[in-house]
């Protein structure tokens, strides 16, 4: 494996033996240069419009040339997941590490991680029982774009005690913290590596650390460990070497066998099989073809040493777990808990001051090497990424990759295909067009509109703006969506989509910061009260009596785009609202707990808007009709800052925006009556004759 050779830190050597150091260094320099010269394709640039024009000077003739930059999200349907290495790659690259000639533990930086952004935090990976340091191999490329990654390699023959490993990691942490004191340091530990991370954090409560613990070892299962230790003790010392020689002879001399395994592995790859089964068979074949590597990785004496390390590390962590002050993210597999107890994880989550537990229900003991686990996405979804002292939802936000957007499209496919959204916008001359052409390309822009029940309108609108115009809406959302409550009534994973797509907790300060950054901001003044309205309240606005956004918009000269949406009454009917649930004791208790957990951001407001009860409305689905969106003509505030400082003037503009939102809704309610394709059957017949990807007509404008 090619690596970046790191300078020696506190006695730690680079991950290369003396015989191959020059070769690795040469390869590293070449590959690192190549990586830095290529722009990453997995994280698109910050968008501002569908088509951007950049001008550059020609040194020869000083001519100005316009270059058109395509929307990176325009072909989202064709997006594919980032190429990730597999278990077979892990075993292939582990072969080089197992045969590295021994030596002390040392740090290395994979060359896939050579293109990180500026001011990226440091990530130190602490390996599990294998000790290779390659446990993040499937995640190197994606994590390497947002972190400066160092991985700890512990050679097979190394017998460094746990307390010395902790000191070694601690010295590196202190050295890097001294060098860049404002940069957070992430410790990612797997099983026994998680114990080392907790030990380091407990010994250094004043250093800015973030811990990501993957299936942390919390107890030794004597039912499994004692028989294993006894069996290893009675095995002859030469048995691993004998097995290694047998495997080596079989695979070195039997080229046809090796070729057959490679051919089968390629034949049943995920690309050909298109599912988990193919990948699983590929991994089984990969293990079969790399048994010599496994025998070298876990010889008898090394396994016995690792078991002793495990016992000591767990005892050490449990003795001072109360000293840990770092924020912690625990990733807990749903299967194969042979080194942890869920009771211990519950104790950790209560003991550690800032702890998030994320369950990976479908994964086993080594989730970072399994399909379906993307550590970078998990970090985004838990708001665990930061470049400073605390997470900033605006400056620390990472744009979704094209594949992450495609996942959102796939997740909402039924809603989008079932409702065939019609989106209208208004040009500067007042002409209404069926497209998003009338929306401003450059920010700051504030979109103000009506919230459907449960926010059904959000996904089609946000996705359409990104794919058609490359406009990324930063939605202002209720803070409850960003809370990681362990005893919540709902699975907090259902809120991941809001964090991936750029949601921000609503506050005056966040509106200010977003508009200052010239963002496209989505605001629902009606908030929770509108999104969880009661029977008969469809299309009714629950807005504050006084202006809350006009003056901050005028401060930055933001355009205000009023919009309305209709269609919720064509897809469902509310049969059990908050008034009904309040009369049912069980549902009443659940509603009160949900409201308490969420908190009321308008506490003290005696108007109807302050009555923010959190509940899940009982809905009866209908044969889906159609969603209609109407974006009104943008309202200019540039140059009006002084004028709008006057409360009465600001209130006039506020009422104008509210009136235009109501007019947009009324316009759509009337016009949809003349849409021949409002109902599902005519739309299906149209697409059956014109193609399933064809745009379905609507009413005349």
From Swiss-Prot:
User: GO cellular component annotations, sorted alphabetically?
Assistant: chloroplast; plastoglobule
Q: Name one GO biological process term.
A: triglyceride biosynthetic process
Q: Which Pfam families match?
A: DAGAT
Q: Where in the cell is it found?
A: Plastid, Chloroplast, Plastoglobule
Q: Does the keyword Transit peptide apply?
A: yes
Q: Where is the transit peptide?
A: 1-65
Q: Which residue stretches belong to region Disordered?
A: 37-64
Superkingdom, taxonomy of origin:
Eukaryota
Catalysed conversion reaction: a 1,2-diacyl-3-O-(beta-D-galactosyl)-sn-glycerol + a 1,2-diacylglycerol = an acyl-3-O-(beta-D-galactosyl)-sn-glycerol + a triacylglycerol; a 1,2-diacylglycerol + a fatty acyl-CoA = a triacylglycerol + CoA; a fatty acyl-[ACP] + a 1,2-diacylglycerol = a triacylglycerol + holo-[ACP]; phytol + a fatty acyl-CoA = a fatty acid phytyl ester + CoA
Any phenotype upon disruption? Plants lacking both PES1 and PES2 grow normally but show reduced phytyl ester and triacylglycerol accumulation.
Concerning CDD domains, the annotation shows: LPLAT_MGAT-like
**Family of this protein:** Belongs to the diacylglycerol acyltransferase family.
What does this chain do?
Answer: Acyltransferase involved in fatty acid phytyl ester synthesis in chloroplasts, a process required for the maintenance of the photosynthetic membrane integrity during abiotic stress and senescence. Exhibits phytyl ester synthesis and diacylglycerol acyltransferase activities with broad substrate specificities, and can employ acyl-CoAs, acyl carrier proteins, and galactolipids as acyl donors.
- According to UniProt, the name of this protein is Phytyl ester synthase 2, chloroplastic
* Origin species: Arabidopsis thaliana (Mouse-ear cress)
């Amino acid at each position: 494996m090619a690596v970046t050779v790191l300078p020696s830190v506190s006695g730690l050597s680079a991950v290369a033996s003396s015989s191959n150091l020059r070769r690795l260094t040469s390869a590293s320099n070449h590959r690192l240069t190549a990586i830095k010269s290529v722009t990453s394709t997995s994280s698109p640039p910050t968008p501002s419009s569908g088509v951007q024009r950049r001008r550059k000077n020609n040194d020869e003739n000083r001519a100005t040339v316009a270059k058109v930059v395509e929307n990176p999200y325009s072909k989202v349907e064709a997006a594919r997941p980032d190429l990730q290495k597999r278990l077979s790659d892990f075993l292939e690259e582990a072969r080089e590490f197992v045969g590295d000639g021994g030596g002390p533990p040392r740090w290395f930086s994979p060359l896939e991680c050579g293109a990180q952004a500026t001011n990226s935090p440091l990530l130190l990976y602490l390996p599990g029982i294998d000790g290779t340091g390659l446990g993040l191999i499937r995640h190197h490329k994606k994590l390497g774009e947002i972190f400066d990654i160092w991985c700890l390699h512990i050679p097979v023959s190394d017998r460094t005690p746990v307390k010395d490993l902790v000191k070694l990691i601690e010295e590196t942490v202190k050295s890097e913290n001294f060098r860049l004191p404002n940069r957070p340091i992430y410790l990612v530990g797997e099983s026994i590596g998680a114990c080392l991370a907790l030990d380091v954090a407990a010994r250094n409560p004043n250093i800015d650390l973030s811990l990501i613990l993957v299936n942390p070892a919390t107890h030794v299962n004597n039912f499994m460990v004692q028989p294993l230790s006894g069996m290893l003790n009675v095995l002859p010392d030469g048995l691993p070497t004998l097995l290694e020689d047998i495997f080596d002879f079989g695979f070195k001399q039997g080229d046809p066998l090796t070729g057959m395994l490679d051919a089968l592995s390629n034949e049943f790859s995920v690309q050909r099989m298109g599912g988990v089964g193919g990948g699983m068979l590929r991994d089984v074949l990969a293990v079969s073809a790399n048994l010599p590597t496994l025998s070298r990785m876990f010889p008898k004496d090394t396994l016995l040493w690792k078991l002793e390390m495990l016992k000591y590390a767990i005892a050490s962590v449990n003795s001072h777990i109360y000293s840990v002050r770092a924020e912690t993210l625990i990733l807990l597999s749903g299967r194969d808990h042979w080194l942890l107890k869920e009771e211990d994880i519950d104790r950790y989550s209560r003991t550690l001051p800032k702890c998030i537990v994320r369950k990976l229900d479908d994964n086993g003991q080594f989730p970072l090497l399994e399909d379906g686990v993307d550590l970078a996405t998990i970090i985004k979804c838990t708001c665990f990424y930061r470049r400073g002292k605390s997470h900033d939802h605006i400056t620390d936000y990472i744009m979704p990759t094209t594949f992450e957007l495609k996942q959102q499209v796939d997740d909402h496919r039924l809603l989008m295909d079932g409702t065939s959204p019609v989106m209208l916008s208004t040009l500067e001359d007042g002409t209404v067009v069926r497209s998003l052409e009338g929306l401003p390309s450059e920010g700051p822009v504030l979109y103000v509109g009506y919230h459907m029940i449960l926010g059904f309108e959000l996904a089609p609108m946000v996705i359409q703006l990104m794919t058609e115009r490359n406009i990324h809406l930063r939605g202002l959302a209720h803070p409850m969506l960003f809370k990681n409550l362990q005893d919540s009534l709902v699975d907090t994973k259902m809120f991941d989509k809001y964090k991936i797509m750029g949601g921000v907790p609503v506050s005056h300060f966040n509106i200010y910061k977003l508009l200052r950054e010239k963002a496209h901001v989505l605001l629902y003044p009606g908030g929770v009260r509108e999104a969880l309205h009661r029977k008969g309240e469809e299309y009714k606005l629950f807005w504050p009596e006084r202006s809350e956004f006009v003056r901050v918009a005028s401060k930055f000269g933001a355009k205000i785009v009023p919009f309305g949406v209709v269609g919720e009454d064509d897809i469902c009917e509310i049969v059990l609202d908050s008034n009904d649930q309040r009369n049912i004791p069980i549902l009443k208790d659940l509603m009160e707990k949900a409201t308490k957990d969420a908190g009321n951001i308008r506490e003290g407001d005696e108007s109807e808007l302050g009555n923010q009860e959190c509940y899940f409305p009982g809905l009866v689905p209908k044969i889906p009709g159609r969603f209609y969106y109407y974006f009104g003509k943008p309202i200019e505030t540039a140059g009006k800052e002084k004028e709008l400082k006057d409360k009465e003037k600001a209130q006039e503009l506020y009422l104008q925006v509210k009136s235009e939102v109501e007019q947009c809704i009324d316009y759509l309610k009337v016009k949809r009556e003349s849409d021949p394709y409002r109902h599902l059957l005519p739309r299906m017949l149209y697409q059956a004759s014109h193609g399933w990807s064809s745009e379905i007509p609507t009413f005349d404008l």
